[in-house]
Amino acid sequence: VAESTNEPGRATSVHHVVFAVMAEQLPETAQFFSELGFRFQTIELEDVGLRVLLDWDGGLELVTPLGADGSGEVAQFLQRNGPGVYSVVIRVDDAQAAEQVAQRYGSRTQFQQHRGGDGFELDEIEISVLGLPLTLLSTDLP
């Protein structure tokens, strides 16, 4: 096992798990997790065609496509696999540097975005590396 370094791109923690859910299953799925104690904030990301239910503190995110046209990564995932774990989000100090590390292991970048405003910055890069669905997240949010 290789020793970790203090190079940029270092992981700081597993941040949260993302489940892809069919639109018609979202209310019941959210209710189930709510009864377990999760508290979701709903975010409509029209620019990427997603409805997101996020419990940032609880470490859980539910995503479903907004449209019925079947386009987008989440819709394609659901068509191929049905509902399930879409990604495990790894918090890193520098998402771009972590992506470079992953590229040395043959990663494939599927999506990346930068969001900011209202006092926050967030960089997110979805990758597949060594067969694992991961998202690299660097942010100044807690």
List PLM regions with ranges:
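N-terminal strand-loop-strand beta-hairpin
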Residues: 39-56
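Vicinal oxygen chelate
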Residues: 1-10, 13-24, 51-64, 73-142
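N-terminal beta-strand motif that seeds the catalytic metal site of vicinal oxygen chelate
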Residues: 1-31, 36, 85-88, 140-142
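DNA polymerase sliding clamps and clamp-related checkpoint/processivity subunits
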Residues: 65-66, 79
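Short amphipathic beta-strand starts and helix->beta connectors
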Residues: 2-5, 68-75
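Short, tandemly repeated low-complexity microdomains enriched for cysteine and small residues
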Residues: 43-47, 72-77, 105, 114
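Conserved acetyl-CoA-binding loop of GNAT-fold acetyltransferases
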Residues: 34-41, 105-109
